[in-house]
């Protein structure tokens, strides 16, 4: 894949750092910005226009599902991959209903995040079963 610009959204700074490390280990991938909640994610997505957004599902204030819906309304060409600590089938449904192109359980992040981002950038869904 060519150069990919990624917006990372999570309310925990340590998690954002880990995601940045994992994503930027891929050749040509760059985390172009970070956000700590859904409202900030919507603002940054409009300002930065990343190739893909990796977003936590559960955050204070505007959560990842609400932010994804808003991003899909304003910039539907930017795919979103949801990450979640809560690995239940209902979370997959919520992610799909919000317009996300992928959903990865945090326990599988190191194994599944890169394939999920690659799929999303190609505008292909990536919804493996959650535990």
Give a label for each model feature:
Residues 2-15, 19-23:
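Conserved acidic segment of CheY-like receiver
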Residues 28-36, 44:
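Short hydrophobic/Thr-rich beta-strand motif most characteristic of the beta2 strand and flanking loop
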Residues 37-40, 63-66:
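Acidic catalytic/metal-coordinating carboxylates
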Residues 48-54:
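Active-site beta3 strand of CheY-like receiver
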Residues 60-61, 88:
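The feature encodes the CheY-like receiver
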Residues 90, 108-121, 125, 129-130:
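C-terminal output helix
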């Amino acid at each position: 894949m060519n150069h990919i610009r990624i917006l990372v959204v999570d309310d925990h700074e340590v998690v954002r750092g880990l995601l940045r490390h994992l994503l930027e280990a891929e050749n040509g991938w760059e985390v172009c910005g970070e956000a700590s909640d859904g409202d900030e994610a919507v603002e940054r997505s409009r300002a930065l226009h990343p190739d893909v957004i990796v977003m936590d599902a559960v955050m204070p204030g505007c959560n990842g599902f609400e932010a994804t819906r808003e991003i899909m309304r304003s910039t539907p060409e930017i795919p979103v991959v949801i990450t979640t600590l809560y690995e239940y089938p209902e979370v997959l449904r919520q992610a799909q209903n919000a317009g996300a192109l992928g959903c990865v359980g945090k326990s599988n992040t190191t194994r599944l995040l890169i394939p999920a981002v690659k799929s999303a950038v190609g505008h292909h869904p990536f919804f493996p079963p959650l535990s």
